[in-house]
């Protein structure tokens, strides 16, 4: 089957904005999923239903955007009512649009809109993608960030359970999430689609030869696990690495400059081009101690072939055994970070080809596309047989 010639039709339901300037890991993963489906089935055969308040000047005829909450009060009322991404009117219009379609696959790119999936009347194999186990995500927010997340905790849990009940297949980023979903909701048919990137590595020619100290890099947005982890690293590890310099890059991290910056810690924050900093860095650090799903920045660092020092949580879902302690180093304590960084990082460290090769073999999007296509075709075939049996 050639790309663009597929007769199958697909509906992609997104619970959040991801087309306009995707920056966080969830948005990047949603865009990856959407582009994968368009690559497999053809642009004209994939319908989009997305909840967003961004005003697009142009949309294709098969792309529909429905408004989400306008303010915090609407968000609170709707979440209490179990409507996590939109109000009653927007939900009704979205379901009307969905029910007007004739598709072979309903791909729900969020497990927190299970009630919408439940109320869809059209046929087609139903696949739910789990960015993480949202119930556990909300639990972590309650424990580490804000008690106000108790309301989403119950709403997410209810919708997630309904999503599993309404799905024919569930897709997870890693085996940990699959096992947790099975324990919580009794999921049966599943597939693992890990975080991937299209290979965008281009070595920059800028000369950094005047550097004296080795450069460490942390990339992450102003998100609770990132803040907690990098704050710990700056306070506990960097005083022991006074002959190193750490750059902190990521959306809105400049807001934490006063709190985090030291003589050997430079807070850059939001940047247009991350590749400049990846090419500058001798190594990447990922001190993430709690979270869910897979960490997108781990795959990104691998794409750039960076020697990486990361916690078990930051490496969750990644097969790194062939480069363990030969390019990717697991560190879970202050002592492990200090010892392994000192032993394995120097000024002007070159690209680690072994780390980059693992990315190209396992986490480059094209490598996973053929496997994912086979899974989707199998889903359609099995769903068709089930429908014939019911008749």
Where are the model-predicted features located?
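N-terminal subdomain of nucleotide-sugar transferases
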Residues: 1-57, 101
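Membrane-proximal helix-turn-helix segments that form the acceptor-binding/catalytic region
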Residues: 35, 92-96, 134, 149-170
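Acceptor-binding helix/loop patch of EC 2.4 sugar-transfer enzymes
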Residues: 70-83, 127-158
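Donor nucleotide-sugar binding/catalytic pocket of nucleotide-sugar-dependent glycosyltransferases
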Residues: 161, 165-203
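Acidic donor-binding loop of glycosyltransferase active sites
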Residues: 168, 279-293, 304-306
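Short hydrophobic beta-strand element within catalytic cores of glycosyltransferases
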Residues: 297-303, 307-312
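A charged, aromatic-enriched C-terminal amphipathic alpha-helix characteristic of glycosyltransferases
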Residues: 346-381
